[in-house]
Amino acid sequence: MQELIEKIRQETANFEITDKDSAEAFRLKFLVRKGSIPQLFEQMKTVSKEDKPAVGKLLNELKLFADGKFKEAMEHIAANELAADDLADLTLPGRTHFLGAEHPVQKVLGDMKRIFQKMGFSTATGPEIERDAYNFTLLNFAPDHPARDMQDTFFIKKEADAEDVVLRTHTSPVQIRVMLEQAPPIRVICPGKVFRNEAVSARSYCVFHQLEGLYVDKGVTFADLKSTIYSFARQMFGSDVKMKFRPSYFPFTEPSAEVDITCYLCGGKGCRVCKHTGWLEILGCGMVHPNVLRNCGIDPEIYSGYAFGMGIERTALLRYNIDDIRLFFENDLRMLSQFE
């Protein structure tokens, strides 16, 4: 019996396991129920009582040896397979990584910010949920001004005995916050998201983006405002752009104006985009109203300033000849992929 055990031990030791097939052959020959080693355990009943301890010890050692060899071989095979999977064929082309593209609205906003930053403007932001005081009162809006009506503004809270809370309708409240916190000179742009209770159409949306600018210092004049707007328009729309200022009205500026540029599509000759006028409106502006300066603790007898504001989506519509503002909010890759 001991000679048979030694013979099978030699067979297990000499058996080469190089892959899964040879490992399975080893298992079937030595380890399964009808394999060589289990069959030796079946023959233990024929061993004399005196020899059983020694034979049993040899059998247990044989089984441990065979099990260990099989386990070690399987681990080695698995490690080799894993290493083979990790091998890279350096002759193959690399995998293409599809990166997202900057949204056209953000492209335009980024260009605007860079232009004004070169002029010395810093950037300020503020909350999108705003108090009535910052959104209307301190900006010289009369109590019965149409903009305060629920038909034009989204109210978060509207109570008779408490201050209204609204979704800001412009980024002008940021200018108020800056003037309340900072002494002149002030030169700042205020980009951000604004909200209007308007019907959604190809030309209007209930959410859009604005960029407003403010400059307050001693001796600021309308000529300074015109110079700033001219410089911006030439850098944004081209050096050959023509401009005109039209008188307008805003509660927070006096005098006020709206600025038109020659239609960049038709060169001022008239087309569908400019409604055959040859001109496109790009922004509103004016000299900061003395009441607004007083509301912010700035003496209008000493300081003056100008402010301007424009819609980012509107500028993007003009720049990219897009005819529907809703496309900016639909995340349609067929449209957005054109700006990669």
UniProtKB/Swiss-Prot annotation:
One of its GO terms (cellular component) is cytoplasm. Its cofactor is Mg(2+). Mg(2+) binds at E254. It catalyses: tRNA(Phe) + L-phenylalanine + ATP = L-phenylalanyl-tRNA(Phe) + AMP + diphosphate + H(+). Its main location: cytoplasm. Its EC number is 6.1.1.20. PROSITE patterns: AA_TRNA_LIGASE_II. One of its GO terms (biological process) is phenylalanyl-tRNA aminoacylation. Keywords: Aminoacyl-tRNA synthetase, ATP-binding, Cytoplasm, Ligase, Magnesium, Metal-binding, Nucleotide-binding, Protein biosynthesis. Binds 2 magnesium ions per tetramer. It holds the Pfam family tRNA-synt_2d. It is an enzyme of class 6 (ligase). Belongs to the class-II aminoacyl-tRNA synthetase family. Phe-tRNA synthetase alpha subunit type 1 subfamily. HAMAP family: Phe_tRNA_synth_alpha1 (MF_00281). PANTHER family: PHENYLALANINE--TRNA LIGASE, MITOCHONDRIAL, PHENYLALANYL-TRNA SYNTHETASE. Tetramer of two alpha and two beta subunits. This is Phenylalanine--tRNA ligase alpha subunit. It comes from Chloroherpeton thalassium (strain ATCC 35110 / GB-78). The lineage of its organism: Bacteria, Pseudomonadati, Chlorobiota, Chlorobiia, Chlorobiales. The gene is pheS.
